[in-house]
Regions:
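Class I S-adenosyl-L-methionine
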Residues: 23-24, 28-206, 226, 281, ...
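Short, solvent-exposed loop/turn segments at secondary-structure junctions
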Residues: 133, 194, 223, 243-244, ...
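Structural motif
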Residues: 164, 188, 236, 443-444
Length: 567
């Protein structure tokens, strides 16, 4: 059995004499191990059908019917209702005959008689999603695409009727059936899941029921198998690839699907991929972004909210083409649309798609122009990982214990009282920084999970859990409190959000923030103003904000833009 924890964690638990380490994960929200079945509400055409599908799932679980027979039986019923086979299962068209001969399965009468709704766009895909456990979907990355997203991505292609279209992760065939004005023999689908392939074949025959054709749906590993597909060149490749489901690999599998799909595009061919928003800015995907902007034309990036049951990741759709790179691409967020510069992507440290407006770019350019120093020469420390918060943290102080702060107690400039206490014994802790970092006479601490930097000052030598990290800054000409003033400034929050777009405040990003050269008088002034905020326990100073805006020559209109962005 594959271990559920990393080897490093295993070593730490062994060091700490933790027993039944694998079982620790059963008390946590470990989706990869979940056997819970979740009804994907966003996949329904009519939410009134949810109780019907819930009843069906209970029936299937009680009877313990095999998935393949369940789905085959439901598909047979749909073919009957569409008039493509009769009540004796005799096919009326050769594609239905081919499908029935391919799958030597016996229909289940109880499923043939079940009162399925007749107004669902993809009933078979919906049944499959309802039957699969949360853990299965999480491990494979297989969450089927809601119809409203399918329609939006498939719409507007405008290719010829005989354009070759491929979905390399076709699932139930939702994207392919969206091209109902195309020749179905020119629509190709691939999936590694044989049940998904069977569903897609049923769905293709049902959608194009007035045409007699054999669905071009195939079961193989698109990334590793060498088949006739590799010899074809497609006018459109459209898909929702698995996110993070590449077994035994460090990279997300969608990266591999993207790279191979671009190789299979015809000259001028289009590509439309649904991707996690991490594609836009996470450092590990820098190589992929660089590959795209240097070799292909980015047409549009559309931003969606999280919309898959069981998935909290926001996502985007990428529209690109096999053409020379252009200077800009279109950004679509809700009803708003605006052009964004490819140059800004190329100029960023990690080649991120910041989806910047021209106003965003102008502000970032002003900040970069004044950069004289950064935080790269500073000292950094991680918060403590106890390995067992439940037993090692205390809710009240007791002899020998001391306060330990979390990210929740960090406010701009100051800390609220600690709510947890710890007996500090480094040998019994899973992760610690050096003592001299925790016990430094002065240090800054910041929230690890946040959409913008939030820093506080500590001069008590306090301990911090790993929801907070530590910075002892070294910026020439600046006191630690002056640095704190810059880090909590609206301008720096804006720079971080637009330059990195991450919900984690990472050292690698913070080290790139642009600090200016200042006079000793400026340092004294800012140090005193920040000290006043700390002592009075205030989180905001208009004096500091305006001073830093003036320092970077940020206009009143740009200040308003920054403040609206941060709201």
């Amino acid at each position: 059995m594959t271990p559920l924890i990393s080897t490093a964690t295993q070593r730490n638990w062994k060091k700490l004499n933790v027993r039944s380490a694998e079982n620790k994960l059963t008390t946590r929200a470990n989706k990869r191990c979940s056997v819970k079945k979740i009804i994907p509400a966003e996949y329904f055409s009519d939410l009134k059908n949810i109780p019907v599908l819930e009843t069906f799932v209970r029936l299937a679980e009680q009877k313990k019917y095999p998935f393949n027979r369940i789905l085959f039986s439901a598909g047979i019923k749909q073919l009957q209702q569409a008039g493509l086979i009769d009540e004796t299962f005799f096919p009326c068209k050769k594609n239905a005959a081919s499908l029935l001969s391919e799958y030597d399965l016996k229909p289940i009468k109880e499923i043939l008689d079940f009162p399925f709704p007749d107004n669902e766009n993809d009933l078979l895909g919906l049944i499959y999603q309802c039957l699969r456990s949360e853990g299965e979907k999480n491990i494979t990355g297989a969450y089927y695409t809601p119809q409203k997203i399918v329609s939006r991505m498939a719409g507007g292609f405008g290719g010829a009727e005989n354009s070759l279209i491929l979905d390399p992760c076709c699932g139930s065939g939702a994207f392919l059936t969206g091209f109902d004005d195309h020749d179905p023999s020119c629509l190709f689908g691939v999936d590694i899941d044989p049940l998904a392939v069977m569903i897609a074949k049923f769905n293709m025959i049902l959608r194009f029921k007035n045409k007699d054709f054999i669905p071009q749906i195939f079961c193989f590993d698109f990334l590793n198998d060498s088949t006739f597909i590799n010899a074809l060149r497609f006018d459109l490749i459209i898909t929702n690839p698995p996110w993070g489901a590449a077994a035994g690999k460090d990279s997300d599998s969608f990266s591999d699907f993207l790279r191979k799909s671009f190789r299979l595009l015809s000259p001028g061919g289009r590509l439309k991929f649904l991707l996690p928003s991490a594609f836009l800015n996470v450092k590990s995907h820098r190589g992929l972004r660089e590959f795209l902007i240097n070799n292909y034309r980015i047409e549009k990036i559309t931003v969606y909210p999280a919309d898959f049951t069981g998935v909290v990741t926001p996502y985007v759709s990428l529209d690109a083409s096999n053409e020379p790179p252009a200077e800009s691409y279109l950004v679509q967020t809700g009803k708003a649309a605006y052009p964004s510069s490819v140059r800004a992507v190329k100029n960023s440290e990690n080649k991120i798609f910041g989806l910047l407006t021209r106003s965003d770019e102008q502000i970032l350019e002003k900040a970069a122009a004044l950069k004289a120093f950064d935080l790269s020469q500073s000292v950094w420390g991680l918060g403590i990982v106890t390995g067992d918060n439940k037993n090692k943290l205390r809710d009240a102080c007791e002899p020998g214990a001391e306060p330990i702060y979390t990210g929740k107690e960090i406010r701009p400039y100051f800390l609220t009282p600690a709510k947890k206490f710890l007996h500090y014994d480094r040998s019994q802790l899973q992760q610690t920084a050096k003592d001299e970092i925790y016990r430094a006479p002065e240090k800054l601490v910041y929230k690890f999970i946040s959409d913008r930097p939030v820093f506080a000052y500590d001069d008590t030598g306090a301990l911090f859990l790993n929801s907070a990290n530590i910075l002892i800054p070294n910026v020439p000409g600046m006191s630690i409190k002056t640095v704190l003033g810059f880090l909590n400034a609206e301008l720096f929050q804006f720079i971080y959000m637009k330059s990195f777009g991450d919900i984690k405040i990472l050292k690698s990003n913070l080290t790139l923030l642009p600090f200016p050269r200042i006079t000793p008088e400026t340092d004294v002034f800012l140090n005193a103003e920040v000290d006043r905020l700390i002592r009075s326990r205030q989180t905001y100073s208009k004096t500091i904000q305006d001073f830093i805006y003036d320092l970077y020559k940020i206009t009143s209109a740009q200040r308003q833009h920054i403040q609206e962005t941060l709201r």
